[in-house]
Amino acid sequence: MKIYVGNRKIEDGSYQQIPDPSILQHVADDAECTMIILDGVLRRYNLSQVAEIIKLCQKKLRLGGILKVVEVDFDLLVYVYQKLGNIVELNNAFMTNEVRSLLTLDLLLEMMKANAPDVANVNFSRVHNIEFDVEFVRK
């Protein structure tokens, strides 16, 4: 089973799309998923909730299954602000009430290590200017 958690339109029909990670508990059995994509959803939760989401994803992944996280990197966001000085755009991002935690790649890696010890980082890339895309595999 492949699960996409996020609000972007996806073309790949092999994924079941859900808007919220809490729904994962109801749509997949433990160790059923071969792929879970969390696309821009972690920032909607505080850090303790993010830790619980990570644990849930680990539980739902089968051995060799991949967890892919796409998220805004706060370090890059600050860098872009310092270079471009567009405080209006930065404020708009926080005014939507969609941001409850500020994640960086390093923080996510630390949280994965602490909350999902059976998952290892396997791939990392940048998506756009301020987002990271990182994949973890359950071992």
Model-derived segments and spans:
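Class I (Rossmann-like) S-adenosyl-L-methionine-dependent methyltransferase catalytic domain
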Residues: 1-28, 66-139
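A short acidic, Gly/Pro-enriched loop at the edge of an enzyme's catalytic core
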Residues: 24-38
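A short beta-strand submotif of the Rossmann-like class I SAM-dependent methyltransferase core
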Residues: 34-41, 50-53
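A short His-aromatic
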Residues: 43-45
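Short, function-defining helix-loop hinge/capping sites that tune catalysis or transport
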Residues: 47-48, 78
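A short glycine-rich, Lys/Arg-flanked "PGG" loop and its adjoining helix->strand segment in the class I
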Residues: 51-66
